[in-house]
């Protein structure tokens, strides 16, 4: 209702919801008109200009409308995105007729350089248009990809009427959390350290055992095992996925621990409200007084994996999103990085206290105020050496991560004192900075005196930041990978593996393909192909050597000793499936060897004793000790042959079958060399040589332990190939006796490992692979975007990395072609754009700081993404033009016919040769990878820039209504003025109690005479000249119908009581309200949907 049509006696201007919706639809996000504006209210220097808000969010001005051209328009604020709005009563208004004119000032604040402006207009109609436009821009996000984070709504529990939530998972747990005073809690079954190292004297938190029950409504109940009574419950649906974390084993010396709870600093980063554990068991204890986090330890790794995925499915996800775009355009980030801490140097200062108390030094890696990884403790050393690596996989940007170097004093009375020596801030920019990919020494500054350097620390950081689309986008890619010829896929890798300059890149590439084909259940096929590739290379080498009449035995003696895609894949795969086996089979023996600290040295030059008689006696004792340890380890391996995971034995079986085909002479020795290279050299010996790297011990090994384990590994490697020690290491020739005695046992063991003969050994390790795992009763669509079990493989991440690799491989081919053409044409030749994949594209999935934080020099329109709906076929998204660019003429007209058939849904005919089918399938796989690559970069560019909107979004009434629900207001007092402050959401828990939604359920007109019966108000502002305390009255009303629409002539009563803002009516209550029509001409229908249809029909017929 415009001000001109208002009755004079009303003295109140209404801003109805329908006016807001109409303004959005007709004026969109732009505004034009004559407005008074200034930058400083106190100066009262108002200027009257023709102001305009453009479709890109710029607030500009010119002298008048006639001069509003590109040369005369000057910007006031360049970007209104995420602006903050305040409405101030204008006591000094030059507009005298308050009934006909607007006497309010709109204050607009942005984070830019010119960050504040005051606006006032003469008419209420213009005021509403301007306010609508500013509200719209306040909901748009500013530039920078990390500013586009959103958090999903809590998962709603769907069950049958009156049905109780079901129990999804039940576990026995050790819990570190708040100790409830009125409940006797049983002690934990496993003795673990406190995560904070120092014991808490008030005993408010501690370890206890409990039964954990995860229910289908997202509640995790902790129960007493004795009688099943409730200790307390956690509402998992109020947690973020980043607040459910698998703890690094270095924190508690346990690999099966999970952190659950609120991270206030993380929530502050995202601007979210608080969450608290709900203490249900004890009425005497206030839930707000207890800790808001717990740590749970599971008995088995598979239990942790199952529960982790189930909890993640209920938690709220963090994702990047463009306002108004389809959900298939949402992205999650994988912020993966590895921090290596090598050593520190504090030799320039004295670390001892005045009593020379014994101490240890260590480094914590913290983020959001919590410790997530910890180095081992080094005693009484000002130059501590660690060389430890820690892997992190975050879903968010890190804003406040630190390396905290701490000193722990061990007093005589067994009390511990902790001292923070210094800390170094690790930002996201440092993590992604390639300069830290090599060992870098950083200064450590004093905690109290930031200008005083107390030492240095040497670190190395490698990182990988990926932007991942929802799983729906990868459906076609997965189908192609399921049916692809893996030999042709491997050709892509081996063609480019020579360009992989270091082992890290080779390892990363191997893991990508390993994870993908393991998640697709094609892992054995993949190893078949990789082994064929490696053996083909060896066969070619042998043929060339034989042509020269030379001996080729040395080629087979070094079989799989070098690094390749195959060996790196096998290392990762064997340790993944065999980690539990290694732990249960060898960890106890290795700990015993290390803790004994008795030498096994046989080299006389290394024995420090000068007396020859005593030296011989020492060497003899060492020989017995070495023989005993090696015998104990071998017997353990031999006795547990049937416990070795079948996945490992299947790969060894494939390998042996391949070798027996190509090797005619000396087959047994070649097989022994090959099995040794895979099983002993790459599986058993790395764990024996460095048990700390594999988390079997927590402390660094001393020189004696390192040498002992090296000697044991040497003997086992020679045993694995039945090779005698010779003159190269004469002191070890004594151990040839051990090898001779185990000759037959070793052959028997190899036959069992390669399934050449049946293994009748009993299974004695009780591995978790023998335990049946419960099937998670969770919707598959929800599980598709979470890591897969077992092993928590992130399939979508690996598919994103696969896409990146395939495109990079194609770009390498293009570069080679360009060089060839350049040479062939005398430097004048150029590649035609259609001849290569992604030609002319400079896009890359590696992200630099400019992409993340700077505006993109393009006009980002959300509408460009409107057509990118959820689909299994990316060809439908990008259309035929891009597909034509991707086609190559080298296949000929036959290939073009195949392309047309594939894109039109025609299946291959049996007449087409299989080789041509496979070639076409590979071409289609590359094309799909290119499409996904461009899609990711297209969306990422939009996310990096300032948000804008297209015309399609303005037509979406549902979005406009949802926008109205997101706007809050708060009356605040600034000096003598009362200010109405508009907010996109509650900023924090300390916001004023007066903070309310702009559009909520209204109060009955009987209790408020200023509100008419037939009005659905968006905002009501009283313009009467009264006391300042009552000068800014707001009355905010709204209605809900079942389909989410809001209709003009309907007011729902608001239930009284604190904290009821945003509550929704139950269907029963809503139905009762609908039985009483709010207006006389509304039919008395019993159903809200029917009522909605009636309103819609009335609107279409013009209300007749």
From Swiss-Prot:
<dbReference type="GO" id="GO:0005935">
    <property type="term" value="C:cellular bud neck"/>
</dbReference>
<dbReference type="GO" id="GO:0030447">
    <property type="term" value="P:filamentous growth"/>
</dbReference>
<feature type="domain" description="Ras-GAP">
    <location>
        <begin position="536"/>
        <end position="753"/>
    </location>
</feature>
<dbReference type="GO" id="GO:0007163">
    <property type="term" value="P:establishment or maintenance of cell polarity"/>
</dbReference>
<feature type="compositionally biased region" description="Polar residues">
    <location>
        <begin position="1029"/>
        <end position="1043"/>
    </location>
</feature>
<dbReference type="InterPro" id="IPR000008">
    <property type="entry name" value="C2_dom"/>
</dbReference>
<feature type="modified residue" description="Phosphoserine">
    <location>
        <position position="854"/>
    </location>
</feature>
<dbReference type="GO" id="GO:0031578">
    <property type="term" value="P:mitotic spindle orientation checkpoint signaling"/>
</dbReference>
<dbReference type="InterPro" id="IPR008936">
    <property type="entry name" value="Rho_GTPase_activation_prot"/>
</dbReference>
<dbReference type="GO" id="GO:0000131">
    <property type="term" value="C:incipient cellular bud site"/>
</dbReference>
<dbReference type="InterPro" id="IPR023152">
    <property type="entry name" value="RasGAP_CS"/>
</dbReference>
<keyword id="KW-0007">Acetylation</keyword>
<dbReference type="GO" id="GO:0005096">
    <property type="term" value="F:GTPase activator activity"/>
</dbReference>
<feature type="compositionally biased region" description="Polar residues">
    <location>
        <begin position="1052"/>
        <end position="1069"/>
    </location>
</feature>
<feature type="compositionally biased region" description="Basic residues">
    <location>
        <begin position="1090"/>
        <end position="1104"/>
    </location>
</feature>
<feature type="region of interest" description="Disordered">
    <location>
        <begin position="1027"/>
        <end position="1104"/>
    </location>
</feature>
<dbReference type="GO" id="GO:0007121">
    <property type="term" value="P:bipolar cellular bud site selection"/>
</dbReference>
<feature type="domain" description="C2">
    <location>
        <begin position="316"/>
        <end position="444"/>
    </location>
</feature>
<dbReference type="InterPro" id="IPR039360">
    <property type="entry name" value="Ras_GTPase"/>
</dbReference>
<dbReference type="GO" id="GO:0007120">
    <property type="term" value="P:axial cellular bud site selection"/>
</dbReference>
<dbReference type="GO" id="GO:0036267">
    <property type="term" value="P:invasive filamentous growth"/>
</dbReference>
<feature type="modified residue" description="N-acetylserine">
    <location>
        <position position="2"/>
    </location>
</feature>
<dbReference type="Pfam" id="PF00168">
    <property type="entry name" value="C2"/>
</dbReference>
<keyword id="KW-0343">GTPase activation</keyword>
<dbReference type="InterPro" id="IPR035892">
    <property type="entry name" value="C2_domain_sf"/>
</dbReference>
<dbReference type="InterPro" id="IPR001936">
    <property type="entry name" value="RasGAP_dom"/>
</dbReference>
<dbReference type="GO" id="GO:0005737">
    <property type="term" value="C:cytoplasm"/>
</dbReference>
<dbReference type="GO" id="GO:0001403">
    <property type="term" value="P:invasive growth in response to glucose limitation"/>
</dbReference>
<dbReference type="GO" id="GO:0005628">
    <property type="term" value="C:prospore membrane"/>
</dbReference>
<feature type="site" description="Arginine finger; crucial for GTP hydrolysis by stabilizing the transition state">
    <location>
        <position position="561"/>
    </location>
</feature>
<protein>
    <recommendedName>
        <fullName>Inhibitory regulator protein BUD2/CLA2</fullName>
    </recommendedName>
</protein>
<comment type="function">
    <text>Stimulates the GTPase activity of BUD1/RSR1. Participates in the regulation of bud-site selection.</text>
</comment>
<keyword id="KW-0597">Phosphoprotein</keyword>
<dbReference type="Pfam" id="PF00616">
    <property type="entry name" value="RasGAP"/>
</dbReference>
């Amino acid at each position: 209702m415009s001000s001109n049509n208002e009755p004079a006696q009303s003295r109140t201007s209404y801003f109805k919801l329908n006016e807001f919706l109409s303004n959005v639809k007709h004026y969109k996000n732009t505004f034009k008109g004559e407005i008074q504006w200034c930058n400083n209210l106190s100066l009262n220097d108002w200027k009257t200009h023709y102001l305009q808000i453009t479709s890109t969010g710029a607030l500009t001005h010119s002298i008048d409308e006639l001069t509003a051209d590109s040369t005369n328009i000057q910007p006031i604020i360049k970007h209104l995105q995420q602006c903050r709005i305040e409405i101030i009563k204008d006591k000094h208004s030059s507009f005298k007729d308050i009934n006909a004119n607007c006497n309010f000032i709109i204050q607009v604040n942005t984070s830019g350089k010119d960050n504040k402006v005051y606006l006032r207009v003469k008419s209420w109609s213009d005021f509403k248009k301007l306010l609508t436009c500013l509200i719209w821009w306040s909901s748009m996000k500013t530039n920078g990809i990390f500013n586009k984070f959103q958090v999903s709504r809590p998962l709603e529990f769907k069950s049958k009427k009156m049905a109780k939530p079901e129990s999804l998972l039940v576990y026995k747990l050790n819990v570190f959390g708040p100790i409830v005073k009125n409940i006797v809690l049983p002690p934990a079954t496993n003795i673990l350290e406190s995560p904070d190292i120092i014991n808490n004297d008030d005993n408010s938190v501690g370890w206890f055992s409990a039964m954990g029950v995860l229910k289908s409504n997202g509640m995790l109940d902790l129960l007493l095992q004795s009688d099943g009574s409730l200790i307390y419950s956690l509402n998992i649906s109020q947690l973020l996925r980043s607040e459910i974390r698998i703890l690094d084993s270095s924190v508690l010396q346990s690999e099966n621990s999970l952190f659950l709870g609120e991270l206030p600093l993380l929530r502050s980063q995202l601007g979210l409200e608080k969450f608290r554990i709900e203490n249900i068991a004890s009425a005497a204890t206030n839930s707000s007084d207890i800790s808001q986090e717990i740590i749970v330890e599971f008995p088995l790794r598979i239990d942790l994996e199952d529960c982790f995925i189930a909890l993640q499915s209920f938690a709220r996800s963090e994702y990047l999103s463009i306002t108004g775009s389809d959900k298939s355009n949402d992205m999650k980030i994988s912020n993966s990085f590895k921090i290596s801490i090598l050593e520190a140097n504090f030799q320039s200062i004295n670390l001892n206290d005045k009593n020379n108390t014994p101490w240890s030094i260590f480094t914590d890696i913290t983020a959001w105020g919590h410790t997530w990884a910890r180095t081992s403790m080094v005693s009484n050393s000002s130059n501590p050496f660690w060389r430890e690596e820690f892997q992190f996989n975050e879903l968010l940007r890190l804003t406040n991560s630190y390396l905290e170097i701490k000193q722990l004093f061990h007093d005589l009375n067994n009390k511990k004192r902790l001292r923070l020596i210094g800390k170094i801030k690790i930002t996201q920019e440092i993590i992604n900075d390639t300069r830290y990919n090599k060992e870098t020494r950083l200064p450590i500054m004093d905690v109290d005196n930031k200008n005083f350097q107390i030492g240095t620390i040497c670190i190395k950081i490698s990182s990988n930041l990926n932007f991942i689309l929802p799983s729906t986008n990868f459906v076609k890619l997965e189908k192609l990978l399921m049916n692809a010829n893996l030999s042709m896929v491997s050709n892509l890798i081996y063609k480019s593996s020579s360009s992989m300059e270091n082992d890290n890149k080779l390892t990363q590439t191997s893991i990508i393909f390993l994870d993908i084909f393991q998640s697709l259940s094609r892992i054995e096929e993949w190893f078949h192909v990789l082994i064929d590739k490696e053996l083909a290379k060896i066969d070619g080498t042998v043929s060339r050597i034989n042509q020269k009449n030379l001996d080729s035995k040395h080629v087979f003696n070094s079989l799989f000793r070098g690094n390749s895609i195959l060996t790196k894949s096998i290392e990762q795969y064997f340790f993944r499936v065999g980690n539990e086996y290694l732990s249960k089979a060898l960890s106890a023996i290795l700990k015993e060897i290390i803790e004994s600290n008795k030498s096994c040295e046989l080299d006389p030059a290394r024995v420090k004793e000068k007396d020859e008689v005593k030296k011989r006696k020492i060497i003899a004792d060492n020989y017995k000790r070495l023989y005993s340890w090696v015998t104990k380890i071998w017997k353990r391996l031999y006795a547990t042959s049937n416990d070795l995971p079948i996945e490992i034995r299947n790969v060894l079986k494939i390998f042996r079958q391949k070798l027996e085909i190509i090797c005619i002479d000396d087959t047994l020795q070649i097989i022994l060399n090959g099995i040794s290279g895979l099983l002993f050299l790459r599986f058993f010996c790395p764990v024996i040589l460095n048990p700390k790297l594999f988390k079997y011990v927590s402390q660094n090994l001393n020189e004696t332990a390192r040498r002992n384990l090296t000697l044991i590994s040497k003997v086992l490697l020679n045993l694995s190939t039945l090779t005698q020690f010779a003159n190269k290491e004469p002191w070890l020739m004594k151990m040839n006796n051990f090898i001779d005695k185990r000759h037959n046992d070793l052959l028997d063991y190899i036959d069992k490992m390669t399934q050449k003969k049946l293994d009748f050994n009993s299974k004695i390790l009780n591995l978790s692979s023998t335990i049946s795992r419960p099937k998670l009763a969770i919707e598959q669509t929800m599980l598709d975007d979470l890591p897969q079990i077992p092993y928590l493989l992130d399939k979508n991440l690996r598919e994103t990395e696969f896409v990146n690799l395939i495109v990079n491989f194609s770009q390498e081919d293009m570069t080679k072609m360009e060089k060839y053409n350049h040479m062939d044409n005398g430097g004048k030749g150029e590649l035609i754009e259609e001849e290569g994949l992604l030609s002319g594209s400079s896009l890359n999935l590696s992200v630099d700081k400019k992409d993340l934080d700077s505006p993109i020099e393009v006009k980002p329109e959300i509408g460009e993404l409107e057509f990118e709906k959820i689909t299994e076929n990316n060809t439908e998204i990008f259309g035929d033009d891009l597909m034509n660019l991707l086609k190559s003429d080298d296949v000929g007209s036959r290939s073009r016919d195949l392309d047309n058939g594939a894109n039109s849904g025609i299946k291959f005919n049996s007449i087409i040769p299989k080789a041509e089918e496979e070639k076409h399938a590979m071409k289609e796989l590359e094309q799909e990878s290119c499409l996904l690559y461009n899609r990711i970069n297209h969306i990422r560019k939009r996310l990096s820039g300032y948000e804008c909107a297209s015309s399609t979004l303005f037509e979406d009434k549902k979005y406009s209504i949802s926008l109205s629900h997101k706007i809050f207001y708060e009356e605040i007092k600034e000096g003598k003025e009362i200010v109405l402050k508009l907010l996109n959401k509650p900023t924090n828990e300390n916001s004023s109690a007066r903070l309310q939604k702009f559009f909520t359920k209204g109060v009955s007109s009987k209790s408020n005479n200023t509100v008419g019966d037939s009005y659905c108000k968006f905002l009501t502002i009283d313009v009467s000249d009264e006391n300042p305390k009552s000068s800014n009255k707001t009355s905010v009303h709204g209605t809900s119908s079942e389909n989410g629409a809001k209709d003009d002539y309907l007011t729902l009563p608001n239930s009284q009581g604190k904290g009821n803002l945003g509550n929704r009516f139950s269907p029963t209550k809503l139905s009762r309200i609908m039985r009483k029509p709010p207006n006389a001409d509304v039919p008395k229908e019993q159903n809200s949907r029917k009522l909605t249809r009636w309103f819609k029909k009335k609107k279409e017929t013009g209300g007749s």
